Amino acid sequence: MKKPLLLTLLCMILAGCDNPKSLESFTPEMASYSNEFDFDPLRGPVRDFSQTLMSENGEVAKQVTGTLSQEGCFDTLELHDLENNTGLALVLDANYYRDAQTLEKKVQLQGKCQLAALPSAGVTWETDDNGFVVSATGKEMKVEYRYDSEGYPLGKTTINSQNTLSVTAKPSADPRKKLDYTAVSRVDDRQVGNVTQSCEYDTYANPVDCRLVIVDESVKPAVSHHYTIKNRNDYS
C-alpha cells in the first residue's frame, strides 16, 4: 500500500488529522448569557476565560472574565466597561447570582442555572423548550432573541414605546468560524450601524484573537471604530 493512501486511511480512522476535535453546539446558558451580557459565546469544556476589547490606541475598553462549572454554569462572571465607567461582578449562590462585593442578590435563576429575573429592574426572562432565553420583559420594554440551529445568537429586537431597535447578525458559512460575522443595527426601518468581526481560532473553534470594526451610521459622514479582542480560553 502506498504511504499517502495509508496516511489517508489512518487520518480517517483517527477522525481527521487536521480536525482533531468535533464541533460542539453552544449551550443554552452560554448563548443566553453572551446575549444578555454582550460577550462572544464559547463552546466546548471551557472552565475559565477572558475577553479583552482594546482600542486602536492599545487601551482596554471592555473586559469580561468568567469561570464555569463542569455542568456549564457560570460560577463567576465579571464585566468592566471602562469607556462608560461601569462594571458588574457576580458569583453563583444556589438559585441566585450575588454581587461579589456586597453579596446582594442580583439575578434570580431558573432550571439548572439559566436567567430568570432581575428583580431590581423588574425584568423577567423566558426560555424556549430547549432552555434558550428567547425574551426579556420589563416595565417599558421587551427584548426578543434569535439563535441558529447550533445555538449561535443571531441578534435581538428591543421594543419600547418610542421605537424598535433590531440587531441582525450573520455568521460565517464555515461552521468553525462562527465568530466571523457581520451585523446590522436598525432603529425602526433606518440602518444606524454595522459591525464586522474576523478571528483566529483554537482547536475547539473558539476565538483567540479578533479584529472588530464598528461603523456608526447615525452620523454623517459615518465614523468607523477599530478594535482588537484578546481571548484567553482554558479548558478542563
What are these language model-derived features?
Residues 17-236:
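Buried hydrophobic residues that stabilize the cores of well-folded domains
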